[in-house]
């Protein structure tokens, strides 16, 4: 049902947006309900917000221009790794795609998904956790030698880089690996700027951890893998090696040191033979699908959901999906000049007062946004009065 809806929108929008069909992106997110009873699509499942409420799961495909292509709505307790292939099959069938590269994050890169997209003319690009690689591959990734720059055969030792001159450069290394019967192209990048960013983020988390130790030690028992509390440990032994009368909290220096060794490194796996830098660039565009979810949740108020029936829940997300397509179209027509918030606010402010027998009087102030909008779509509604005939023509224009 969801994929068919996407297909119809795709056909109607073909003349409006040139869909990039070679590379598509897939991701999942959850939407919570202000209800406590789980039934139908509403089920208790893993939630990033950690709210004790039922959720539904949405899977979304997007093209390389950030335009959504298809979505599915699944029960909140569904394993998200199983949701991609069924929707992808429907997408390929509806859009008659003959060649496809699917880009995902590590959480959706199950071996079965990688193998599926290694058949025929399909391909995959997925982020790869260096920490989860086999020991010898992990050592190879972190080895300071045999790195190179884009379009260069010169070898570099990243332990000898100039902090200032090389701060904006991205270094690469690559090799083919065979994991569980699947040949994959492992690509690793290293950047001083990315290293410094990770250190900055961790520094803030360490400060929060130290503050927790000092001011709120009772909160230590509630932590997650990416929580700053992972840097805190309980200790029952004094620095002198004696058993303490009472356990105490301190920073876990071992965890901090282990994480530091990965600073600046980023890895992807793919079955493509393309240039490493090109593949990394494709993977970087995943931020657009994360932005799609953020826009739906914040600007389109897709959550919390207050609906009970499954058919109405699906209808709710169809409306959000259609709104997202229209927003992407408007954004591209305006040259991505305005944030989503400003664009929506500008549209909401464009109101008219109907004057019987004469037409419509604009009640909004003429701004740079309204000028850009009128120029992009070849309309003019900021005149003193828009006649009834003129408004009919404008409305007809939007349906062509």
Where are these regions (language model features)?
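Anion-binding and metal-coordination hotspots
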Residues: 1-400
